[in-house]
């Protein structure tokens, strides 16, 4: 009884540890990596691969304010690319957009009711000055109404793999600022929300698919409709741009956001040499607990410093890396009984400077490509047969990617194996038959002794 009780107690102690290991968030950071950020949530990723470098409360659903406009930008660039609209296409200002544009509490370029503006003018006002009425104008152009545009936002969010999002308008404003004309089906005090991880994933796709967005987001200031009576100075709210008060080397985007719900938030991107990072901070505050422009940019600076100073881009596995115990896979009915497997390319990723030589890979076979543990001949060279998950030699967690996938690379066959002819198959069958008899015989003889 005493022995059984000890076993039960041991199991009860082990289970919580296992549960914590199994369900630990891939972006979670250890205590020694605590950056002391005063934010509700934050995340730092490699803009090229989506690899998570740091995370704090990144899965919590929070207000995102004008960072919502990154989705509007994505849908605009997609429409331009597909030829559905053009940069020089004109938009006629609606009563709704006009009313919002006249609200001096908001970031806006004042629009004249019934006046025509090009899509390029509206986009630059959005990207540089976070102009809300201009954003509504783009939404109405793309979908006919902001109500219909929200459906486009939802569909694209699902397609891009965003999680736990809710869009109620195109701008990120609280609906109470929309002059009673907020989109149908949304509440008068509703606001867009999303986890920091989804914000980072949206920024990742925006930069991957439409890097030209940086041409506008990197502009510190510009005059809207220069040379006309409607001219107005547009100062970029991203004060980390070169020449601005909180400038940071390499910053060229991306989007700020400020509401009571979202606080002072920011999605920034910076590039140094061949490394580009994306940082997201939600509801940043100072040491007194007050939100401010400085607080959000200080938090972003800490993230960028951590990424650029602590990580290096290194080749951690060569293209000819051999999987110990899995150098080849068996092939059924082939001219050869097995086929060599390997990586498609060297594995290069951002790693801690001190950890460059501490990584290896675990081969995970794609069972859908196999039958009873074997590949079926013929097998083409370059056939995908599974994934190689990157693992740390010391057992430390390897951050996954912002889209939820593990750090991995494709594993393929390194040669072709043709299907054996009937004569070869017959010889193989005979050989297997006698090999089986030999194994049984030797086993019987060993049993005698």
Question: Predicted regions: what is each one?
Answer:
Residues 2-30:
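Sec-dependent N-terminal signal peptides of Gram-positive bacterial secreted proteins and lipoproteins
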Residues 18-19, 81, 303:
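Hydrophobic alpha-helical membrane context
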Residues 3-4, 66, 296:
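Short alpha-helical segments used as structural interaction elements across diverse proteins
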Residues 179-180, 187-193, 197-449:
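Domain-terminus/edge residues, biased toward the C-terminal soluble/receptor-binding domains
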Residues 26-197, 207-210:
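Active-site-adjacent loops and short helices of periplasmic peptidoglycan-processing enzymes
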Residues 7, 21, 25, 39-40, ...:
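N-terminal pre-first-transmembrane soluble regions of secretory-pathway and organelle membrane proteins
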Residues 19, 37-38, 60-61, 102, ...:
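Generic detector of short alpha-helix boundary/capping microenvironments
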């Amino acid at each position: 009884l005493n022995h059984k009780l000890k076993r039960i107690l041991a199991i009860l102690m082990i289970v919580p540890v296992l549960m914590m290991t199994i369900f630990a968030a891939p972006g979670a950071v250890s205590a020694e990596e605590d950056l002391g950020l005063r934010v509700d949530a934050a995340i730092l990723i490699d803009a090229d691969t989506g690899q998570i470098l740091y995370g704090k409360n990144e899965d919590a659903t929070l207000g995102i304010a004008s960072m919502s406009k990154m989705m509007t930008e994505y849908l605009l660039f997609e429409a331009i690319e597909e030829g559905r609209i053009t940069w020089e296409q004109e938009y006629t200002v609606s009563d709704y957009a006009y009313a919002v544009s006249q609200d001096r509490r908001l970031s806006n370029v004042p629009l004249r009711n019934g006046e025509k503006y090009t899509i390029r003018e509206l986009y630059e006002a959005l990207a540089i000055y976070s102009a809300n009425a201009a954003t509504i104008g783009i939404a109405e152009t793309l979908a006919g109404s902001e109500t219909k545009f929200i459906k486009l936002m939802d569909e694209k969010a699902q397609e891009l793999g965003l999680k736990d999002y809710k869009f109620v308008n195109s701008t990120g404003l609280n609906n109470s600022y929309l002059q009673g004309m907020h989109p149908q089906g949304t509440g008068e005090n509703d606001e867009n929300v999303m986890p920091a991880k989804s914000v980072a994933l949206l920024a990742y796709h925006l930069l991957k698919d439409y890097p030209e967005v940086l041409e506008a987001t990197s502009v510190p200031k510009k005059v809207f409709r220069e040379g006309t009576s409607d001219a107005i100075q547009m100062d970029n709210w991203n004060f980390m741009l070169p020449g601005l008060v909180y400038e940071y080397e390499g910053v060229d985007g991306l989007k700020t956001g400020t509401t009571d719900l979202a606080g002072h938030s920011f999605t920034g991107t910076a590039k140094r040499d061949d490394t580009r990072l994306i940082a997201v901070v939600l509801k940043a505050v100072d040491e007194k607990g007050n939100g401010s422009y400085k607080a959000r940019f200080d938090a972003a600076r800490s993230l960028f410093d951590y990424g650029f100073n602590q990580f290096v881009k290194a080749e951690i596995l060569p293209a000819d890396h051999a999987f110990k115990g899995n150098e080849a896979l068996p092939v059924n009915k082939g001219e050869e009984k097995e086929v060599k497997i390997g990586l498609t390319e060297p594995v290069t990723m951002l790693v801690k400077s001190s950890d460059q030589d501490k990584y290896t890979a675990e081969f995970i076979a794609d069972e859908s490509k196999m039958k009873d543990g074997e590949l079926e001949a013929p097998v083409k060279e370059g056939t995908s047969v599974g994934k190689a998950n990157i693992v740390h030699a010391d057992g430390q967690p390897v951050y996954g990617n912002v889209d939820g996938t593990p750090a991995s690379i494709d594993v393929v066959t390194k040669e072709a194996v043709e299907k054996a002819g009937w004569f070869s198959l017959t010889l193989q069958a005979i050989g297997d038959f006698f090999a089986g008899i030999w194994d049984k015989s030797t086993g019987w003889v060993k049993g005698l002794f």
